[in-house]
Amino acid sequence: MKALFLMGLLALVASAAFAQYGEVVGSYEGGAGGGGAQQCPLGTKLDSCRNYLLDRCTTMKDFPVTWRWWTWWKGGCEELLHDCCSQLSQMPPQCRCNIIQGSIQRDLGGFFGFQRDRTVKVIQAAKNLPPRCNQGPACNIPSTIGYYW
């Protein structure tokens, strides 16, 4: 019973830390313009980017009637990447990395999140998403997001 209580308490503390971190991710410092702290669009969902980064490439638009499923799978990934790049191009450049990080953070975080090696791969892909879309330099996403221990 003690172990269950401690797990619940740990989950509560972890979710509170995650919520506080999520509030910080939405802002950025204005650079040469001297405008100070500005707000990025909060609540922006990049579902296609999230699904692409998490290897959820099945689009289910055309269910394959073929035994060559790998062709269908690859096509789904490329379609998601195209949609993701299109969505990223509509974001302010200074907000892209924060929005990318926010889109995958809930899947990587928490007590029962991804395994460590899988998390590192997803974060690396997220860092390289803007250059892959020809939309600026790589993101500086810390490789420790999602872990509280």
Swiss-Prot record:
Pfam short name (any one): Tryp_alpha_amyl
GO molecular function: nutrient reservoir activity; toxin activity
Tissue spec. comment: Found in endosperm and aleurone layer of developing kernels, but not in the embryo.
PTM (free text): Five disulfide bonds are present.
Keywords recorded for this protein, A-Z: Antibiotic, Antimicrobial, Disulfide bond, Membrane, Plant defense, Secreted, Signal, Toxin
Gene3D superfamilies, alphabetized: Plant lipid-transfer and hydrophobic proteins
A single GO BP: defense response to bacterium
Propiece span(s): 20-28, 148-149
Leader sequence residues: 1-19
GO CC annotation: extracellular region; membrane
Compartments, as annotated in UniProt: Membrane; Secreted, Extracellular space
Function: Acts as a membranotoxin, probably through its antibacterial and antifungal activities, contributing to the defense mechanism of the plant against predators. Forms monovalent cation-selective ion channels in membranes. Contributes to grain texture and hardness.
Name of protein: Hordoindoline-A
Organism name: Hordeum vulgare
Gene: HINA
